From Swiss-Prot:
Chain positions recorded as Zn(2+) 1 binding sites: 47, 68, 179
Cited PROSITE patterns: ADH_ZINC (PS00059)
The keyword Lipid metabolism belongs to this UniProt entry's keyword annotation: yes
Purpose: Catalyzes the NAD-dependent oxidation of either all-trans-retinol or 9-cis-retinol. Also oxidizes long chain omega-hydroxy fatty acids, such as 20-HETE, producing both the intermediate aldehyde, 20-oxoarachidonate and the end product, a dicarboxylic acid, (5Z,8Z,11Z,14Z)-eicosatetraenedioate. Also catalyzes the reduction of benzoquinones.
Protein origin, superkingdom: Eukaryota
The species this protein was found in: Rattus norvegicus (Rat)
Cofactor note (record): Binds 2 Zn(2+) ions per subunit.
Keywords: Cytoplasm, Lipid metabolism, Metal-binding, NAD, Oxidoreductase, Zinc
Tissue specificity annotation: Liver specific.
Name of the protein in its database record: All-trans-retinol dehydrogenase [NAD(+)] ADH4
Location of the protein in the cell: Cytoplasm
Length: 377
């Protein structure tokens, strides 16, 4: 491509300050440095994590190019990059896999030591590894976000945060594999390890929660109870495999008590994809005594209280990061599984808009009217 080695001027949505609409601006994207790849973003989505970062309580750095769920095409590569070439279809992600560190070499985790280069692994990654940015606008340096920054027509990522995928992949669907689908689906398959014939409860029916429902279904769960305070999400949950749907606001007793009654003692597996203090407690309480397992997928609170009695009686709580998948190795396989119709991503996509309408996509999400909105340039 004629742009290799040159600064690219393109369109981006920049967050200049907290709690404000994103601004469509021209941005300059520098060429990739060593072990970096510059990507032309084809499709991206808005995830709640992107918008939560603009909350003043998060103390994010501004201005910043948000976005971390996308798919695109390699425009150019930096020195030392051997696994990618211009024209490759790729999916970037916030969970790196360097394949060299102690964590990457262990089969016990999907974390990577590269996360230690950043203040907080799933939120910041606000600069490249040399502690500089590849973005400028209006003569100001612009921060990166979660190692991806997909709200720009071109972005630069580390090769450890990138996977090459099938040349025939539909980028307007497999972009969901960059975060939301993979996190929820893997939470059920890899972390909870849902078993055939088991009973499951999934709290929160956004993209991650609905993907967890898909995972429970594929794992062979015989009962999948989906919980959300927005009943409009229930038809989609049932279409994806939920057997029961509960809205806590419609019940005359705590939802965990209702689940315990429905299942004759509690579910084998619960997955909290909402992450509030209330859902965390309910997700633990609704599991069966003796072996009940609660997997924490989303977390909007920094701390949770767990009864030691619950632990003594056999209940367990575990967390999951990127669905337990080793990212570089697993993302291409997930794309192949989608191509082979092992699961359907179409039901997770509720809207499609041009990138210029990104603030409309955010409004749809905040109003609970969308699961995922695909944005294209």
């Amino acid at each position: 491509m004629g742009t290799q080695g040159k600064v690219i001027t393109c369109k981006a949505a920049i967050a200049w300050k907290t709690d404000s609409p994103l601004c469509i601006e021209e941005i300059e994207v520098s060429p990739p440095k060593a072990h970096e790849v510059r990507i032309k973003v084809i499709a991206t989505c808005v995830c709640p994590t992107d918008i939560n970062a603009t909350n003043p309580k998060k103390k994010a750095l501004f201005p910043v190019v948000l976005g971390h769920e996308c798919a695109g095409i390699v425009e150019s590569v930096g020195p030392g990059v051997t696994n990618f070439k211009p024209g490759d279809k790729v999916i970037p992600f916030f969970a790196p896999q360097c394949k060299k560190c102690k964590l990457c070499l262990s089969p016990l985790t999907n974390l990577c030591g590269k996360l230690r280069n950043f203040k907080y692994p799933t939120i910041d990654q606000e600069l490249m590894e040399d502690r500089t940015s590849r973005f400028t606008s209006k003569e100001r340096s612009i921060y990166h976000f979660m190692g991806v920054s997909s709200f720009s027509q071109y972005t630069v990522v580390s090769e450890a945060n990138l996977a090459r995928v099938d040349d025939e992949a539909n980028l307007e669907r497999v972009c969901l594999i960059g975060c939301g689908f993979t996190s929820g689906y893997g939470a059920a398959i890899n972390t909870a390890k849902v078993t055939p014939g088991s009973a499951c409860a999934v709290f929160g029916l956004g993209c991650v929660g609905l993907s967890a429902v898909i995972g429970c279904k594929i794992a062979g769960a015989s009962r999948i109870i989906a919980i959300d305070i927005n009943s409009e999400k229930f038809p989609k949950a049932k279409a994806l495999g939920a057997t029961d749907c509960l809205n806590p606001r419609d019940l005359d007793k705590p939802v965990q008590d209702v689940i315990t009654e429905l299942t004759g003692g509690g579910v084998d597996f619960s997955l909290d994809c909402a992450g509030t203090a209330q859902t965390l407690k309910a997700a633990v309480d609704c599991t069966v005594v003796g072996w009940g397992s609660c997997t924490v997928v989303g977390a909007k609170v920094d701390e949770m209280n767990i009864s030691t009695v619950d632990m003594i009686l056999g209940r367990s709580v575990k967390g999951t990061f990127f669905g337990g998948w080793k990212s570089v190795d697993s993302v291409p396989n997930l794309v192949t599984d989608y191509k082979n119709k092992k699961f359907d991503l179409d039901l997770l996509v509720t809207h499609a808009l041009p990138f210029d309408k990104i603030n409309d996509a955010i409004d749809l999400m905040n109003q609970g009217k969308s699961i995922r909105t695909i944005l294209t340039f």
